[in-house]
């Protein structure tokens, strides 16, 4: 495929400072990358190898400037509708990838850069602000707030300009993955450490929020689910290995005993926040611990449930229904050669793990949400094997309904990719030997089949909880291209939903056919039909977030960021959810000042005022 020719392309780069920012924004020593004159001229054409390479890399260009005082954004198309609710759209993601000493890190290891878009419907304006999350790692790596020296490896990176051999600073909590407003607090989360609390108006970092400590203080709400265990000798061996690993992981690599996942769930029916944590040693042992926490609107612990699953799994996202927590297990294994290379510092620490494709099915664990469900159901430690090998990426929704057998029908709407494509430290095309990302990894020849796509998992349980049928199919036959970041109207979480929205590929660019996404697809799961809105030219889009206004399931607006990388611009886009697929779906587009253009965000959150 032609995209394979992108990999060896390495054009010269020139560093220069940003233009002066607006008065109310704080400017650090900004650096951005541009092509040489020859490369820039070639990239002027939309669909060339050069344009594809530079557009892709500009999507992950560092932004060192912060906007401490909010500024109004200029409307470039349309207008803010009068029925748009007052509230704030928060977007988490990395802000910086390269330091001043020659190191470039994986996008997943970039320091958290929180963006805020505050809607004031009274005066029909949107105010923007942005700040780095002041984590302990950020304060160490940028002591004066201007210059940067990366000292932490992070799980996915190798420091070209920093200490490699003997560098045990692996757990680099960058608070860059997701953002949550709950119980009067705004939290930035990362896959493996404490959340950081941030002031919801000023975005000033308050400090780490000890969520697990808060839960441990109320352990009388904890219940341990029982399950059939392995032979006692095997279990004793795993227990001994865990006891040996914990002090090493904690004392040497500074890993917390439990790592909180960055993906959370909100149960609107019960008014609860649901979160899950894993044990640190689970990454290295063929056994997985999961602790689920449920908090009320005041951040008081309502319930805590613990499960031990006899499988070596990696979980990024998960689901829940009225009676179950649901894990779609991504099977992994320890990579011994990779582990040795990782310990030397010459390979990323994540190289110690590899996908385990030996089984051609996907384990689905239905974990009872209450002791009552556990008492009346199946052995939850035995997974339901979905008849398709897939790597679970993100979950849009899950729900359950009573069926004619006296049991339950469970449905999940999610994105998944192929084990054949998924590669831990090559995600986004990262290669620690080079300072540029390789677009061809995310645009592989078999990308249409291998990259994330939208699927439905359907499970039929009888009255005893036994699985009678499990199936996996595309969510829509009309849209078979890669798609991810599934979202729904949050009012319909944990109940039957009709619509799913996701970032998607239109396939309009020959050399970037699959990623980055350039469209939003709206799937009607009742009939499998699909409609979409696409940006034009050399532009990409991020995760869609639904803002409900009433008037039915699709009564509301879809927010997303458009990255016009060739023009060094970002726009906040407002779509009418009902009109996606028509010419007038675009309601408004607002421009972020050029000097504040930011790299691709990961996950966002809408909070009503």
Curated annotation (Swiss-Prot):
Its cofactor is Fe(2+). Keywords: Chloroplast, Dioxygenase, Iron, Metal-binding, Oxidoreductase, Plastid, Transit peptide. Fe cation binds at residues 263, 316, 394, 603. It is found in: Plastid, Chloroplast. Residues 1-34 form a transit peptide. Induction: By auxin. Its EC number is 1.13.11.68. InterPro entries: Carotenoid_Oase. Expressed in vascular bundles of roots, leaves, stems and panicles. This is Carotenoid cleavage dioxygenase 7, chloroplastic. It comes from Oryza sativa subsp. japonica (Rice). The gene is CCD7.
